[in-house]
Amino acid sequence: MTKKRLVLWDIDHTLVDFTELGAAWYGTAFTAATGATLRVHPVFGGRTERATTTDLLTANGFEAAEETIQALFKALVAESERHSPTFADTARALPGAAEALAAFAADGDVVQTLVTGNLPEISRHKLAAFGLHEHLDLEIGGYGTLSVHRPDLVPHAVALAAAKHGTEFGADAVVVIGDTPNDVRAAVDNGVVSVGVATGHYSAEELRAEGAHTVLPDLADTDAVRNAVRNTVLS
């Protein structure tokens, strides 16, 4: 019997490219949430939204109180909602992303969801612009609201997937796919498989140095992506 696998996808620079778009929302969202003007801009790089928001508030002279964090989350979702009709024109799905997702969706032994620093609503907006959401179970993802530490998102998603599908996913059956060292560490810290994709700001060598078990140049070769998910072994 074929082993059931759980594939946990990153979004930005793995499946889609929204370069600079998200950063532009923060000025409006910050003012809506705090009444102040944003002076110090956020740093992303595979971090969770909770980490980004916490540091953003502190850097701009505000206490990172939960009420303020939630207000900023709400304002960011509103900005994403407002701009979402233009996403298909201002952003892009990365080569091979749709094909890889569709290939795994056609396999009865693969469950696909997200481990992403994005907020749940923004995740859907970004993916829906290119029809990518159709192949993912977004209800069982690990999102950036949960923790400042990205590795915390992995067991959350695994637990939700196990409960929904009635399957215990062993460490070698959980595959995290992403483009940053933070994606790699999220997998390695939880003892699961890391597949790095060098489609962002980090080279294949940098991802391997962080401990990625397999590194792909991109998602363009669907067979290579499927092979990485099915045949990569933990070392």
Spans of model-derived segments:
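Active-site neighborhood of HAD-like aspartate-dependent phosphohydrolases
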Residues: 1-45, 51-59
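Short, acidic loop-to-helix structural element flanking the phosphoryl-transfer center
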Residues: 8, 82-114
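Conserved H-loop
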Residues: 63, 133-137, 213
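Substrate-recognition "cap/lid" segment bordering the active-site pocket of phosphatases
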Residues: 113, 118-175, 181-190
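Short acidic-hydrophobic, aromatic-tinged amphipathic segments that line or gate anion-handling sites
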Residues: 142, 214-219
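Acidic, Mg2+-coordinating phosphoryl-transfer loop and its flanking beta/alpha structural elements
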Residues: 176-214
